[in-house]
């Protein structure tokens, strides 16, 4: 379980996080949504240990990350996986070598064992034929799949996704979401997913958290966020939905088939 308690963070006198708190239960993926510039990526970097809060605490299975020595934090990060906006692949390495990199750097596996694991993971993400390609030779969707394979190669307990579908077309967005969903079901990790893809992400997450003005204003299921009486949350959701989804919401009760809400776009 991850517990984020009353995080505060300022940059150059500007307070970005103003007491943000969130709990992520084991096996749950939480979508972190909210207006642009509200600090969602900053929040995620605190959870990963890349930033330290001005005040507040972050617990992973009861252990306070903010109180760990550097060596302890590095060891704990090995249980985390990260998927960044740009994928962060090494341009000079093939897809195979990118995915193998964490195993070569952080384990004592033989090259034979590494090869078995890398090829198996590439198969899982649909890149079995792309092991010898370089990032410049990949489409946007393929690059995200390669980055996801690298993030998953050590079977992390926690996955952190920072807008993993930014810049992709709707069909590729849908395929990446399906891949995240299938890998979550396969590996059972807990996770936080920062996204502006509403309502698509609601189809496969267990909870939704709404970050607004530095605090987590709402936490609930995808169904509950559509039913909330909080006008700020409701207005944000309505402003994020396309017109066909709004008509859909007015006509039928909430359901998780977001493809229907999108008018059948897959």
List PLM regions with ranges.
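Helix-to-loop junction immediately C-terminal to a conserved catalytic motif
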Residues: 48
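Conserved ABC ATPase "signature" region
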Residues: 63-64, 111-129
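Conserved signature/switch motifs of ABC ATPase nucleotide-binding domains
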Residues: 133-136, 154
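A short, surface-exposed alpha-helical micro-motif characterized by mixed small hydrophobic
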Residues: 201-203
């Amino acid at each position: 379980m991850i517990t984020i308690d009353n995080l505060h963070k300022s940059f150059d006198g500007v307070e970005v996080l103003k007491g943000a708190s969130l709990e992520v239960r084991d096996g749950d993926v939480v979508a972190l949504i909210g207006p642009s510039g509200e600090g969602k990526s900053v929040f995620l970097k605190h959870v990963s240990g890349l930033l330290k809060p001005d005040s507040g605490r972050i617990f992973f299975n009861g252990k306070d990350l903010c109180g760990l020595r550097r060596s302890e934090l590095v060891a704990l990060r090995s249980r985390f996986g990260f998927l960044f906006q740009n994928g962060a692949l090494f341009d000079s390495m093939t897809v195979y070598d990118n995915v193998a990199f964490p195993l070569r750097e952080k384990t004592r596996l033989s090259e034979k064992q590494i090869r078995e694991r890398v090829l198996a993971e590439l198969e899982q993400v649909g890149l079995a034929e792309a092991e010898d390609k370089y990032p410049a030779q990949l489409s946007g969707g393929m690059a995200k799949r390669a980055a996801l394979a690298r993030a998953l190669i050590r079977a992390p307990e926690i996955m952190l996704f920072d807008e993993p579908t930014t810049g992709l077309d709707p069909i590729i967005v849908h395929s990446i979401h399906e891949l995240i969903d299938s890998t979550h079901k396969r590996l059972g990790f807990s996770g936080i997913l920062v996204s502006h893809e509403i309502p698509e992400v609601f189809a496969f997450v267990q909870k939704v958290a709404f970050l607004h003005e530095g605090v987590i204003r709402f936490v609930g299921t995808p169904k509950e966020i559509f039913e909330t009486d909080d006008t700020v949350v409701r207005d944000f959701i309505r402003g994020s939905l396309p017109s066909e989804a709004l008509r859909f919401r007015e006509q039928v009760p909430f359901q998780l088939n977001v493809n229907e809400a999108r008018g059948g776009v897959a």
